[in-house]
Amino acid sequence: MTQVTVGENEGIESALRRFKRQVSKAGIFADLKRLRHHETPVEKYKRKLQQRRRRR
């Protein structure tokens, strides 16, 4: 779960930017996209390949 605490002197815009960055790093949107639609075997293979590359 991604969580961002807003500091006392911090603006909402910067906190929102930090939140978006954390969400994209965690790959939450990619997971949602994957779960929303049917995934063909070729797409599954490509996704796993990307995950392997990302881990390196």
UniProtKB/Swiss-Prot annotation:
Specify the signal sequence span.
Answer: none
List the keywords (alphabetical): Ribonucleoprotein, Ribosomal protein
Q: Which domain of life is it from?
A: Bacteria
The GO terms this record gives for MF are: structural constituent of ribosome
Classification via Gene3D superfamilies: Ribosomal protein S8
Task: Output the InterPro entries linked to this UniProt entry.
Answer: Ribosomal_bS21, Ribosomal_bS21_CS, Ribosomal_bS21_sf
A Gene Ontology annotation in the biological process aspect, one of them, is: translation
> Record keywords: Methyltransferase included?
no
Instruction: Return the similarity comment.
Output: Belongs to the bacterial ribosomal protein bS21 family.
Q: What is this protein called?
A: Small ribosomal subunit protein bS21
Q: Which organism is it from?
A: Synechococcus sp. (strain RCC307)
